[in-house]
Design a protein with these regions (language model features):
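Membrane-penetrating hydrophobic segments
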Residues: 1-12
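A hydrophobic, helix-centered structural microdomain
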Residues: 12, 16-36, 42-118
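C-terminal terminal-structure detector
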Residues: 14-16, 20-21, 184-208
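Cytosolic-biased juxtamembrane loops and peripheral soluble domains of multi-pass membrane proteins
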Residues: 47-52, 93, 117-135, 139, ...
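Generic recognition of short, well-ordered alpha-helical interface segments
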Residues: 52, 56, 71, 108, ...
Length: 208
């Protein structure tokens, strides 16, 4: 009986992991470059040996280890999201990534567990975020469990374990060239903003 229960748990984990991997691990060619008349090209900085080679290896090791260790958590959260919010389980959002060859930010799909409903008004427009955000969703955000799928962003090379947190694409028009230099480093799962106050700190403190 215990063996059957253990087998069913691992089968569930395998199913969820396969679904996540199928939707998340994509080629870098899937990224697009952000184009805007308000965004000027900036010069890419030269990277050292550590950033070019060693950091990537460490990122992959950490991401794979985290996915294996926390696989029961992935399964549990996925089931809860499905039960409380329905499908899809994952939420995807465009975020600015590394500066491309043309001096402009590439845009990648960042993955999170879904925290909001898809409720719409009578005209078919989504209701405000604060209305659609559920208590369960708030809990996921407060515990950062919604960010677990970002480990797969690390695997496909669009993010790193440590680096500047990616802002929203629409915020880029408000950044000066000095602030946009953050995009010469790969965006991270965690960075200075997270360990120094997270959402409690100001916009300027996050970017400078």
């Amino acid at each position: 009986m215990a063996k059957r229960k253990k087998l069913s748990v691992w089968s569930g984990i395998a199913i969820v992991s396969t679904a996540i991997v199928t939707n998340i691990v994509k080629k870098k060619s899937d990224k697009t470059t952000y184009k805007s008349v308000n965004i000027n090209p900036i010069k890419k900085r030269k990277k050292g040996i550590y950033e070019r080679y060693i950091k990537r290896v460490l990122d992959v090791i950490c991401a794979v280890g985290a996915i294996i260790v926390f696989s029961p958590v992935y399964l549990g959260v996925a089931i809860l999201v499905k039960f409380k919010l329905g499908s899809p389980i994952l939420f995807t959002q465009d975020r600015p990534g590394l500066i491309g060859a043309d001096g402009k930010e590439t845009v990648f799909k960042m993955y999170k567990f879904r925290t909001m409903t898809d409720e719409k008004d009578e005209n078919g427009n989504l209701l405000p975020d604060e209305v659609r955000l559920t208590k369960f969703g708030k809990w996921l955000r407060n515990t950062s469990l919604d960010e677990l799928p970002e480990a797969f962003n690390i695997l496909n090379g669009t993010m790193s374990v440590i680096g500047p947190r990616p802002q929203l694409v629409r915020d880029m028009v408000f950044m000066n060239e000095e602030q946009r230099m953050r995009h010469t480093a790969k965006p991270g799962l965690s960075g200075l903003a997270q360990v120094n106050g997270r959402n409690a700190i100001s916009w300027e403190e996050k970017l400078n």
